[in-house]
A protein has these predicted regions:
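Helix-loop-helix hairpin linking two adjacent transmembrane segments in secondary transporters
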Residues: 154-196
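Cytoplasmic helix-loop-helix junction between adjacent transmembrane helices
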Residues: 109, 113-152
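Extracytoplasmic gate region of multi-pass secondary transporters
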Residues: 27, 224-273, 366-370
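Helix-to-loop junctions at the C-terminal end of transmembrane segments
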Residues: 63-76, 276-289
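C-terminal transmembrane helical hairpin of 12-TM major facilitator-type secondary transporters
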Residues: 290-336
Length: 420
């Protein structure tokens, strides 16, 4: 039974790992992709356009959340996870083979946008769906730990995406090498499909036979819970993408590190976070996930600015301290997060409700976070020290989310059993 659980965690988490690896690789490669698909005389404009396409994928996540959420609620969790990974692999293959602007002109960024939109749809059904699936498979005493494996997979995905970008950015690499991680990711998706088809179907919680609520009744009963998941999605997206994807740009442009050096520093922080997440999740199962999550939010408000403050000095010691702070904050927020959102809705509405709410928050605010951070830093670059604008932007979201959780903690109706 233990081996089956390990296999279940690996196969369910694989899609999330690949999804975040590809998203992170695209974010880290924004400067390179800007020159290939948006060649202009102004590097900042090209970079903003590339981050804009990054954001467009996020904005399609609610569409995927509804489509795959409907499959997950009305058919089975495993079916939704299978088809979301299928779409993800096809899009990665398309981007990996896509000609650049120099070859096909304005069609290149248009086709890139098309694939990113489809990827956004696939992501809308993957991350939360995998978290729901795993949480429903484990007993009450380990559900926070079970959900944390999805957060850990996303962190390791960012590590692999970062390492891919690091090798691509090394001097003397051939021009076409940026395609390889996309193609390898696509191949991994198709291999993962075979594993999912043969294993997850045997473990899947079948959809409830209860009829779905109409929207009017749904928002009358669950509007509070929906808004909580929305805010958690927004905070998670902003925190991760400002302190990770944008942070590479910050280290490169503001601190003066070479791009591949900046990526390696951030990869260290993500790897440490991935290792800490299950530890904090295990502790959250013992003490209560809501307490751990609120504590993590307060720590994020207090210490996120110090991530930028230590990094500004540019020496190895301060950079590593910066990433240790990021890793601890990331793990505190990520460890209990999946458990919290999964238990806010009954089983027959869970996949759609969580995926749509989380995707809306992450799409509107997380997906646009690198673009907003770049804009704030450009407009207010005279502000430095402990008050770097991107760090303050993260603090604002952490504080707002803390108030929302704190105010509603005693008023939330939880659905603790998968069958409820």
């Amino acid at each position: 039974v233990k081996n089956d659980k390990i296999k279940l965690v690996f196969i369910a988490s694989l899609g999330t790992l690949l999804e975040w690896a590809e998203y992170t690789f695209y974010g880290y490669m924004a400067t390179k992709l800007a020159t290939l698909f948006f060649p202009t005389d102004n590097d900042s404009i090209s970079l903003m356009k590339t981050f804009g396409i990054f954001a467009s994928g996020y904005l399609m996540r609610p569409v995927g959340a509804y489509l795959f959420g409907r499959i997950g609620d009305l058919k089975s969790r495993s079916s939704a996870l299978f088809w979301s990974m299928m779409l993800m692999g096809a899009c990665g293959l398309g981007i990996g083979l896509l000609p650049t602007y120099q070859t096909i002109g304005f069609w290149a960024p248009l086709i890139l946008l098309f694939f990113r939109l489809l990827q956004g749809i696939s992501v809308g059904g993957e991350y939360n769906g995998a978290g729901i699936f795993l949480t429903e498979q484990f007993g009450p005493s380990h559900r926070c730990l079970a959900g944390s494996f999805i957060s850990m997979a996303s962190a390791f995905g960012m590590v692999f995406g970062g390492l891919g970008a690091y090798f691509v950015m090394l001097p003397d690499m051939p021009e076409w090498i940026w395609r390889v991680p996309f193609l390898l990711g696509s191949l991994s998706c198709f291999l993962g499909l075979w594993l999912r088809r043969s294993f997850l179907a045997a473990s899947s919680v079948l959809a409830s036979t209860l009829p779905p609520l109409n929207f009017k009744l749904f928002f009358k009963k669950f509007s509070r819970n929906f808004f909580i998941v929305f805010s958690i999605g927004a905070l998670t997206g902003v925190f991760v993408y400002v302190n990770n994807v944008y942070f590479v740009v910050f280290l490169n442009k503001q601190v003066g590190l070479l791009k591949h050096e900046a990526i390696l520093i951030v990869v260290f922080g993500e790897a440490l976070a991935a290792l800490l997440i299950p530890v904090f999740a295990w502790y959250a199962d013992k003490t209560g996930p809501t307490k751990i999550y609120q504590f993590g939010l307060i720590m994020a408000v207090l210490f996120t600015p110090s991530i930028f403050w230590f990094a500004q000095y540019g020496d190895t010691t301060n950079l590593l301290v910066s990433q240790c702070i990021f890793a601890i904050l990331n793990a505190l927020i990520s460890a209990p997060m999946v458990y919290l959102v999964v238990h806010l809705f009954p089983a027959h509405l869970r996949y759609r409700s969580i995926s749509i709410a989380y995707s809306l928050g992450a799409g509107l605010f997380g997906g646009t976070a690198p673009m907003v951070a770049e804009y704030l830093q450009t407009q207010y670059e005279w502000i430095g020290g402990i008050f770097y604008p991107p760090g303050i932007y993260v603090c604002f979201f952490a504080l707002v989310t803390w108030f929302i959780i704190r105010y509603n903690a005693a008023k939330i109706e939880y659905f603790k059993h998968p069958g409820q």
